[in-house]
Amino acid sequence: MSAAAQLILHLTALNTPERVVSIGKVEAAGATNVIPDRVYMEGTMRTFDERERAEVKRRIEELAAANDASYGVRTRVHFTPGYPCVVNDPELIRQAVALAETEGIPFQMLPLRMTSEDFGFYGTRYPAIFYRLGVGPGAGKLHTSTFNPDGAAIPTGIRFMELLARNYFNR
């Protein structure tokens, strides 16, 4: 358990504004007076680009190996292939902003986020833009049981998506 706890601390130290590593699940089959012979951990890693993701993976492997040497344990690191980083095409962003301004659709530029979505696969093959549709205050947080968006936002979302598509194909 001590080795696992130390590894979690080392992994957390990797966090910067450009990358996040977190362990959200730890399982150990011990008891109050029995030190477990195995500890299983799962976590997530988020970055803004694939180059940084590869670097974080390399650092995780290094930290695990150093931790193994310090504690006399063996760590098996396994990375489950996840979604690629969501990267917006700068030209599509420019076009979307211009369309929103021209059409009087309110918008707000958000700071970069480490979005993990299957949409990231599209951006690896085609110019793509991932945007969020504001659904009003009090809608609750996304991916929670309290999320209750205002349905009146849907027509605006449909209209904006149609405008983006028409603009893209008419250029």
Protein language model regions, located:
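Midchain, well-structured core segments that form catalytic/ion-binding scaffolds
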Residues: 1-88, 113-120
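Charged catalytic carboxylate motif
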Residues: 3, 59, 95, 156, ...
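Sec/Tat-exported extracytoplasmic proteins
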Residues: 11-15, 100-103, 168
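Alpha-helix N-cap and loop-to-helix initiation/capping positions
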Residues: 55, 88-91, 149-152
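Hydrophobic "lid"/C-terminal helical patch
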Residues: 60, 64, 100, 161, ...
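Short, low-order "capping/linker" segments at domain edges
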Residues: 86-99
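Zn-dependent metallopeptidase/amidohydrolase metal-coordination segment
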Residues: 105-171
